[in-house]
């Protein structure tokens, strides 16, 4: 690794390193944020575009949500990922995978990007892929929200809907693989199997959270996240384990569709983006804390209340994540510092039950939640490139 470059302190005590190539903040045992050098001689990499995109991804605010839960005041810390380029946490993974693919010579300008997704990943690859000049094809189950399809199409990507009869999510993956096999010059990100998905959150999301909490002189006591690909929860699990030892990262899934517990598709649910019919290969349950279960209706009501009571407009999985985090914080007591993610905002769910009247059933956890206030902990620096 080259040692030639400029180094300066960033906001919140983070160090930023400027080199001739890209500058990344990375996880380190000795400091909350360190660097990793990406040489400028990537495989015909459109470096100016990647640099520009990297400035739009990561470095998101951390929200401190002040609640009363089961009669006890709690503060939950939520990374507000709607501030990314396309408005979701998936931008982190998409940019990281494409940067690494260029570095390893796995993709070249003009190659087609083909991916299977429930929506947010497709939006991220459509936007970032088109910005880099790639044709993009997105395969997705045909029951995802209409907004997702329209956004992807507006970004110049082709959307191939896959019915339940054609295999749904697993059928989407199969069809993307078949297209890549039968066509020339196709790059498959393979988000469910790609270790770079985990690495993206290990190198960016985790260190950002650690640095932001450090400004409050706090360290995380647990992490909670719904599992779609599993990249977020696995990346944070690794980061927390290396930095703080015995700090659990808890995977979360819909109580009415417990894929992680059963190992296969079971039941139906309305939390788009998690529990996608199978357990991804990058998910290692033995490295995670216990699985948390949240009813989809409970998550919907909680997301609705975050918007209507605090003005924080988030997607359905964010409501589930908040409820799961509150459960863990309640178990840990007054010293808990539980972190989660608000993966996106509510704009891609306007045609779903998120914008319908949802019955708040007696057994729902949201009945135990009183939302009091929130404050914003600004990021110290993005986990992606910050200077050139």
Language-model region placement:
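PLP-dependent amino-acid enzyme catalytic core
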Residues: 22-388
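Serine residues within intrinsically disordered or low-complexity segments
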Residues: 2-3, 28
